[in-house]
């Protein structure tokens, strides 16, 4: 019994070590994607805080990969992904129906946001559809979402996050990755924090993704900001653009 308990403890320790392993190396092709001259100045000014090269390395986005940028906003990461996967790869900017409506209410038409990108990057496709019916033209290697996962929980979206995650799970290739970045909420916060503060608890995301069949394989701390304790709205002037953010990488089992 003691030997079995010891073996279980060692296995747990090894698994934890793998999840918290050192950050993967940034390759020259990743650096080149970030240095792409086609990126607008408004995007490059945000690089210091968003650390795009490190994000490419964490997600494992390399030439030839098929990637979905889920709820892509103005396309900050979409451009970088399209350059990173190269002509033999493919990137899909996936706009959920409710997300489309929200952008339009802000005077930001999704098709207009992507028009310039589609002219520049021939490997880019744009998808409009319900998140609970998430589907892609081909199986994908990586589904990425940054600073939007919490929104899916809000009343305005009126959907079940479990249905969304199950649909994403189905779209991925066996061994594919689901990468989620978002504003960290204090673990003592209530579930309504997604709407009041625009944050979400790390434990909530882990529980939801694992319930859909994913396995947590990596966590990153490149976007950690100790000055943000997770109790303020992310739009407060003293933390805007410098919020503490978690990085979680989940994998669909290979079999």
Region spans (language model):
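Class I SAM-dependent methyltransferase Rossmann-like catalytic core
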Residues: 30-58, 62
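Conserved Class I S-adenosyl-L-methionine
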Residues: 191-217
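A short acidic, Gly/Pro-enriched loop at the edge of an enzyme's catalytic core
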Residues: 121, 134-144
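Conserved beta-strand signature within the Rossmann-like core of class I S-adenosyl-L-methionine
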Residues: 175-183
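A short glycine-rich, Lys/Arg-flanked "PGG" loop and its adjoining helix->strand segment in the class I
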Residues: 82-83, 159-174
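A short SAM/SAH-binding and catalytic strip from SAM-dependent methyltransferases
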Residues: 141-159
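Core SAM-dependent methyltransferase catalytic element
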Residues: 227-255
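Conserved class I S-adenosyl-L-methionine
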Residues: 64-73
């Amino acid at each position: 019994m003691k030997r079995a308990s010891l073996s279980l403890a060692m296995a747990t320790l090894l698994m934890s070590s793998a999840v918290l392993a050192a950050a993967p190396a940034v390759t020259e092709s990743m650096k080149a994607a970030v240095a792409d001259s086609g990126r607008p100045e408004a995007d490059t000014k945000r690089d210091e805080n968003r650390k795009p090269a490190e994000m490419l390395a964490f997600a494992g986005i390399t030439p030839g990969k098929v990637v979905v940028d889920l709820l892509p906003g103005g396309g900050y990461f979409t451009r970088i992904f399209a350059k990173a996967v190269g002509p033999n790869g493919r990137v899909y900017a996936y706009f959920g129906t409710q997300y489309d409506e929200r952008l339009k209410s802000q005077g930001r038409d999704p098709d207009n946001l992507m028009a310039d990108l589609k002219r520049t990057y021939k490997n880019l496709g744009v998808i409009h559809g319900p998140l609970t019916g998430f589907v892609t033209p081909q199986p994908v290697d990586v589904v990425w979402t940054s600073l939007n996962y919490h929104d899916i929980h809000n009343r305005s979206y009126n959907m079940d996050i479990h249905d969304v995650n199950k649909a994403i799970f189905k779209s991925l290739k066996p061994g594919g990755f689901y990468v989620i970045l978002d504003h960290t909420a204090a673990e003592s916060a209530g579930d309504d924090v997604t709407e009041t503060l625009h944050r979400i608890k790390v434990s909530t995301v882990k529980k939801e993704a694992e319930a859909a069949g994913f396995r947590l394989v990596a966590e990153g701390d490149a976007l950690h900001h100790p000055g943000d304790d997770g109790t303020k709205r992310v739009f407060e002037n003293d933390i805007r653009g410098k919020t503490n953010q978690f990085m979680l990488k989940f994998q669909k089992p290979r079999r």
